[in-house]
A protein has these predicted regions:
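Alpha-helical residues within the helix-turn-helix
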Residues: 45, 56, 62-63
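Local alpha-helix boundary/kink/capping signal
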Residues: 58-59, 98
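N-terminal helix-turn-helix DNA-binding core of bacterial DNA-binding proteins
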Residues: 8-53, 72-85
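Residues at the C-terminal ends
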Residues: 35, 63-64
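Amphipathic alpha-helical dimerization/coiled-coil segments
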Residues: 1-9, 13, 86-117
Length: 117
């Protein structure tokens, strides 16, 4: 993505960062890694997906400098690069919860309205 009129490098950087987060499995990987480093094998066991899938998602996160890899003997261990990512995920969870509560309220109102007809 290149900057265009009205959009600077910082906005492009932010968009690329959030694009790297825009995958359900990558989000789940990060939710695990904010609690401590893990190997691909450990992530695979927790997530219930195959090793190539986990490795592919970690590669995307590494390319955007969201996670770091550290070799420990023959095992590579992954960790979030910035602990503040846990705060970002927590804020997002609160926003989503409020959105879902609003959606549930709207659905209840629609059901009540449907019953009156």
């Amino acid at each position: 993505m290149k900057p265009s009129p009205g959009i600077g490098q910082l906005q492009v950087f932010k968009a690329e960062f959030f694009k790297a987060l825009a995958h359900p499995l990558r989000i789940r990987v990060l939710e695990i890694l904010v609690n401590g480093e893990r190997s691909v094998h450990e992530l695979q066991a927790i997530l219930g997906v195959d090793q190539p899938t986990v490795s592919q998602q970690l590669a995307v996160l590494r390319a955007k400098n969201i996670v770091d890899a550290r070799k420990e003997g023959t095992v590579v261990r992954y960790a979030v690069r910035d602990a503040a990512l846990g705060d970002l995920l927590a804020v997002a969870r609160r926003i989503f919860n409020r959105h879902l509560i609003g959606t549930q309220t709207m659905l209840r109102e629609l059901r009540r309205e449907s019953r009156r007809r």
